[in-house]
Amino acid sequence: MPTTPVIEILDDSSLLDDSLIEEIISDNNDNVIHPTEIDESIEISIPYVNDKTAESNSTSLGNSQKESSLIVTQTASQRKRILDEILSDDLSISTDDFSLDAIPKQTSGRTRDSQKNDSALYESSQEKASIASSPNRLIKKSSSERHKKSQSIDSKDICIKSPTRKINLGVTESMQTDVLFEDNNFNNIECTQETDLSFSTATADTPTVGFKEITFKHKESTNEGLNSHNFSDSIFERQRLKQYITNIRDITETESQELYNKLIHTEKGLFNAVNQTPRDNFKAREDIIVDFSPSLLSFLDKQTEILKSILAPATIQKSIHDELPRIRFFRKCHSFYDLQHDFFFPSNYKIVEENTTILYFDSKEFFVKYKEDKRSLFEKLKEIERDNYEIILVLYDLAKFKRELEKIEETKYRSRVQSQIYDSQQSIQQNKVTTPQSDYGLKKFDVEQRLRYINREWGLKIHIVNSHNDFVHSLPNLCSIIGKQRMDPAIRYMRYAHLNVKSASDRKDTLKKTINEIGKVPDIKASAISDIYSSFQSLLHDFEAGSLKASSDGNYLMSEALEKRLHKIFTSTDPNEAVD
């Protein structure tokens, strides 16, 4: 009579081999009314150690089934009852040990037969694997809820080093449907199989967001003109032109047309005079008033007569403000500028201030103020800059100040050398004699660094002069530039500064220079074309008619490439389009 196999429990963790259990259940399926539900997810995920008893008993069980079906039925019932007791007693223990420390004690590197076939693992995992939301709950399997639970994974159960991780990754990587992660901090974060278990999903800033809805928004400037980048915008263009053109006024189309018609019929000469661009420096300085602070004007007392002569016909006056050695520029305005229509219309006499100002400092005095009271100096300069002034900082005697600093450095160096040669008492007495009384706390190298810093961080334009005479003789040039900038076409038409603009004497010269520029045509060939077509209008007329005139020798007047380029010029509506 065959012996009854015994199940030996080793380390409270050993179970029967899966192949043996499946063989017994499949052979005696008719005798078992309600098969006991077994948690096969744990069976698949954890290979148990010391399973020698089950392996040795598998042979005897196979022999016993051949001898008597009744004995086999009783044996199967006994084994199932013992197995139920083992599972009910040890299931909670095995689930509590789902940690990295517990796995080496209960498992080995041996792979079960059921895990060798990846396709079988995938099929069984799709039907059986489900993970609870808490480690303290029992892992259950239900045919009705199995598919729903496989579609949701709680964040607490997503552990990289969990023993069930091997099965879960196999399921999620091959899953065709989308996976939905539910967590307290990230509600309904939807992702596909390509983005499954993505770290970027867990670190999203928004609590509810879809991957397709993620967009990156750039912070826009509060300045509307800067956001639109439209140089034709009146507000943005006014802000730019106001720095150079004084007395700007916005008027409507009707008002501009009425003023223009009135002045053309009644005061045409006055209208032309206020719109004439001064080309002479003497003419440009007529309406300029140069305002000197009292201290600066008295400091340049010896240069006053020279200033009056070289700045003429500009007016020199004394300012009422004397906080800084400052020079300001004013203009006598007899007209206002219509920004929308680019006209200067005559108006009542008015004095306006230009945006350029000059600060004239002795180099030593400036760096002493910078070293002792930097904050006060910075606040005064920023107060001037707040009114949209272009500040020019003029320093004189900078080379002299550098030589003085170099001399101080040399004296200090000699003192250190002598202190090492002689004893301390002699060096102390000698230092009292040789050390200079004024130490500015600067080196020659520091001066250049400070000037670069002030130019970059404070926004000042720095100009160096060697003497008062150099500064005085440089003022007329600056005064002329300020006098011309209000009428300068390059400033008024800055919206077209990106275009390559060239001037011509007449229509024929304009056509000749255009052909020479766009077609790289030599001057002789361009002159031959302009002799036949005296203007763009005549050339356009023949282009529209579809027939161009021939040259004097009977050949084509221009090449096919030049014809295409001219045709693009005539038909294009985009001024920025390239002419190929």
From Swiss-Prot:
Residues 53-72, 103-155 are annotated as: Disordered. Interacts with MUS81 to form a DNA structure-specific endonuclease with substrate preference for branched DNA structures with a 5'-end at the branch nick. Typical substrates include 3'-flap structures, D-loops, replication forks and nicked Holliday junctions. May be required in mitosis for the processing of stalled or collapsed replication fork intermediates. May be required in meiosis for the repair of meiosis-specific double strand breaks subsequent to single-end invasion (SEI). Its EC number is 3.1.22.-. Keywords: DNA damage, DNA recombination, DNA repair, Endonuclease, Hydrolase, Magnesium, Meiosis, Metal-binding, Nuclease, Nucleus. It is found in: Nucleus. Its cofactor is Mg(2+). This is Crossover junction endonuclease EME1. GO terms for cellular component: Holliday junction resolvase complex; nucleus. It comes from Candida glabrata (strain ATCC 2001 / BCRC 20586 / JCM 3761 / NBRC 0622 / NRRL Y-65 / CBS 138) (Yeast). It is an enzyme of class 3 (hydrolase). The keyword Metal-binding applies. Transmembrane segments: none annotated. InterPro entries: ERCC4_domain, Mms4/EME1/EME2, XPF_nuclease_EME1_ascomycetes. Its main location: nucleus. Belongs to the EME1/MMS4 family. Pfam families: ERCC4 (PF02732). PANTHER family: CROSSOVER JUNCTION ENDONUCLEASE MMS4, EME1 PROTEIN. GO terms for biological process: DNA topological change; double-strand break repair; mitotic intra-S DNA damage checkpoint signaling; regulation of reciprocal meiotic recombination; replication fork processing; resolution of meiotic recombination intermediates. GO terms for molecular function: crossover junction DNA endonuclease activity; DNA binding; metal ion binding. Signal peptide: none annotated. Residues 55-72, 122-136 have a biased composition (Polar residues).
